A protein has these predicted regions:
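BZIP DNA-binding basic region
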Residues: 96-154, 160-166
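Short helix-coil boundary/hinge micro-motifs
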Residues: 1-119, 164-166
């Protein structure tokens, strides 16, 4: 749960400040809901990339955190005066902070070419990303983390191989 809370503090989803769980039971519930959402998002993205509609169970599980949060939307204006839709969140409990994540995932698959949505190629990474590279060949969620680790591992393997051959 500590890493989840660090991420939540950084991401600041609507309602998080007022609903951050203080007791252990609520923290565990939020952690379990976040892990469940991660599995559901993986299923959603996998289906999207394969050109399939998500399973009904995936849709139901994705709809749960969305239903906990979204109270209403209204038309507003940006700082430049252009129209935009403002979502007014009314979170019911701490796990409701996961609702905007689920909503953004649905909006993402509506707007992204399935060929550009990728799972990170790093063995232990669970992240998905949108490949915006010119050639469409990006394999890592982040070159600073996963890509760098892969390059370092290849370098170490070459060094060990060269040492063994010498």
């Amino acid at each position: 749960p500590a890493l989840l809370f660090q991420w939540m503090e950084h991401a600041e989803p609507p309602g998080w400040t007022s609903l951050k769980p203080a007791d252990i039971s609520a923290q565990r519930t939020l952690h379990i809901e976040a892990l469940n959402l991660r599995v559901v998002l993986d299923q959603l993205f996998t289906a999207h990339v394969a050109g399939h509609n998500p399973k009904t169970t995936t849709e139901h599980a994705l709809g749960r955190p969305i239903s906990w949060t979204l109270a209403s939307s209204r038309l507003g204006h940006s700082e430049r005066g252009t129209l935009l839709i403002e979502n007014q969140y009314a979170p019911l409990h701490a796990a409701a902070a996961l609702g905007p994540i689920a909503q953004n995932a649905v909006e993402l698959i509506q707007s992204v070419d399935p060929a550009r949505l990728r799972r990170c190629a790093a063995h232990l990474c669970l992240r998905w990303f949108v490949d915006t590279s010119k050639g469409g060949r990006r394999g890592w969620c982040s070159m600073a983390t996963c890509g760098n680790r892969a390059k370092a591992a290849r370098y170490r393997a070459r060094q060990e191989r060269d040492t063994a051959e010498a």
